[in-house]
């Protein structure tokens, strides 16, 4: 079942607007050197962002997690939650991304677990399932 929030019917009385698609987690208390994934530059910068991507490539990344060259994007991209977006919605996302200011920023490569990150990163928190 698709999350109501992603189907255009958010339940504003619930956390995350009723969506079951939330951020990935890590445990900085238990993992001294967790793997680190840096988010991509999705501004329309032609050299370091998505400025040279076609609308179809942007839409395919959102809906299927497929990058510009046909490769699967990072595993934390929750594309499964966006797969059922309407054509109008995914076209609006692509149009919005094209409308923002381009920022030249080369993103660091991901860091494998156990290795030291050479760039700063943020822990979003420690999450535990409630019994």
Give residue spans per PLM region.
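Glycine-rich, acidic and aromatic/proline-enriched surface loops and short helix-turn segments
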Residues: 60-68
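Flexible coil segments in periplasmic/lumen-exposed cytochrome c-class electron-transfer proteins
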Residues: 1-38, 56, 68-131
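Residue-level signal for the nucleotide or nucleotide-sugar donor/cofactor binding architecture
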Residues: 53
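Second-shell loop/turn segments in exported
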Residues: 44-50, 79-81
